């Protein structure tokens, strides 16, 4: 599951159409590392947002029915949030309300395949023993998707704030 849900979006981002706004950016200094403090802080903030949503999901599930449901919510949220995060990785600029959000058919396909696999793991009876999760009903699955999706607009908003 992890190989498909991480690898396919990464490959799809490799064929992302170029950003028409990129030439408006100042070039980085020739000796400047790609891994700048600013870039690493963006990674840390994105991770903090996704981690926070995963913890909220865990606590929600834990309060509903204990540790197994909590860990199932956390697993589903983290896997799906990483798929949603692929859209955050398209650009340094916010893309959520632009046509660029949907311009990479490979990323959309990778997202749909990954989401279908994760949904199957969380809802198909019999798979709970293989993946050590609790089978979710529709309302529970909705909670997982909501927690995972929430990271997307939050990170997009942070990108908008950084650019302003």
Feature-to-residue mapping (PLM):
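C-terminal transmembrane helices and immediately adjacent loops/tails
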Residues: 1-164
């Amino acid at each position: 599951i992890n190989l498909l849900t991480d690898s396919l979006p990464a490959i799809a981002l490799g064929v992302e159409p170029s950003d028409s706004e990129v030439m408006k950016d100042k070039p980085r200094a020739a000796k400047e590392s790609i891994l700048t403090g600013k870039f690493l802080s963006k990674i840390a903030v994105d991770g903090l947002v996704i981690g926070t949503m995963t913890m909220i999901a865990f606590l929600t599930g834990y309060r509903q029915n204990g540790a197994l449901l909590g860990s199932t919510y956390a697993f589903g949220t983290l896997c799906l949030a990483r798929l949603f995060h692929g859209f955050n990785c398209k650009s340094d600029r916010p893309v959520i309300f632009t046509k660029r959000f949907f311009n990479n058919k490979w990323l959309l396909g990778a997202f749909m395949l990954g989401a279908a696999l994760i949904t199957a793991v969380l809802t198909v009876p019999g798979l709970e023993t293989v993946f050590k999760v609790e089978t979710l009903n529709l309302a529970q699955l909705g909670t997982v998707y909501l927690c995972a999706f929430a990271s997307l607009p939050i990170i997009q908003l942070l990108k908008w704030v950084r650019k302003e």
